[in-house]
């Protein structure tokens, strides 16, 4: 009887020690599937704690704030790369034409290069072209100033007082330079009329816009020479017939072999 009581007490003591015992996973030999049953839910309690939640929210806000400038910089860099790519493609498209222009006419090529970097050229192409034309006439005016200062001063005074000079300075300078080279052109007209017409074409734009005004101007310029030289007078008659004679337009050489027609009309 006493042995039964002692054995029951021993069993009760074993059960009590088993329920109150703490299991250490590192030193336990139990399977890993049994260990979580005896561990407290530390992880879930930690994530549900307000301090941990506030810390996580702060970290998320800081990460988003730091990522926004990085995203903006990435977008700006992508936009810059896109613009550079488009500019490179356009430059590659124009490179053959620019290379050909540089070989044929280096001055025009340099003017095209300066036009892209000139604010005046981008804002007002007409004003830029007039400025370039004025620069083309500067060497001739400088030579005139060195050879004949009085004539140069007269040109400057006429340039500031003439309505044509104020409205269109390049055209005015072309007319003035044309008047200066009239003697040489007159000799060329007597010797070779075809070459004379070819020389007149790039200098005077008035013939294309208003042929009547051009003829009047030529008469005013060359009438004194025509009085002194009958050959010049005959040539002027032929020149006046030129815009109205289809045959002379087709063959200027043969038209100058008919001075009787010009003398009969005029």
From Swiss-Prot:
Residues spanning the signal sequence: 1-21
GO function term, MF aspect, one: nutrient reservoir activity
InterPro entries: Maize_Zein_Storage, Zein
Keywords: Seed storage protein, Signal, Storage protein
A Pfam family that the UniProt record links to this protein: Zein
Family according to the record: Belongs to the zein family.
Other comment: The alpha zeins of 19 kDa and 22 kDa account for 70% of the total zein fraction. They are encoded by a large multigene family.
Protein task: Zeins are major seed storage proteins.
Protein name: 22 kDa alpha-zein 14
UniProt organism field: Zea mays
Gene it is expressed from: AZS22-14
């Amino acid at each position: 009887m006493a042995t039964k009581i002692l054995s029951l007490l021993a069993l009760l003591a074993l059960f009590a020690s088993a329920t109150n015992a703490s299991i250490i996973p590192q030193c336990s030999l139990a399977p890993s599937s049994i260990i979580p049953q005896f561990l407290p839910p530390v992880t879930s309690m930690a994530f549900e704690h307000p301090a941990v939640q506030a810390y996580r929210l702060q970290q998320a806000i800081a990460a988003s704030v730091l990522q926004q400038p990085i995203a903006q910089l990435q977008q700006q860099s992508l936009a810059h790369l896109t613009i550079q790519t488009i500019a490179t493609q356009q430059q590659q498209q124009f490179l053959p034409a620019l290379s050909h222009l540089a070989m044929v006419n280096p001055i025009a090529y340099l003017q095209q290069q300066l036009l892209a970097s000139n604010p005046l050229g981008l804002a007002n192409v007409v004003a830029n072209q007039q400025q370039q034309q004025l620069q083309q006439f500067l060497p001739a005016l400088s030579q005139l100033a060195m050879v004949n200062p009085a004539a140069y001063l007269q040109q400057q005074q006429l340039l500031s007082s003439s309505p044509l000079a104020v409205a269109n300075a390049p055209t005015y300078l072309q007319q003035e330079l044309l008047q200066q080279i009239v003697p040489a052109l007159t000799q060329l007209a007597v010797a070779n009329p075809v070459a004379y017409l070819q020389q007149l074409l790039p200098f005077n734009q008035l013939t294309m816009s208003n042929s009547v005004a051009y003829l009047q101007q030529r008469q005013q310029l060359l009438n004194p020479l025509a009085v002194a030289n009958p050959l010049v007078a005959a040539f002027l008659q032929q020149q006046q017939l030129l815009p109205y004679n289809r045959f002379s337009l087709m063959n200027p050489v043969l038209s100058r072999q008919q001075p009787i027609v010009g003398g009969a009309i005029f």
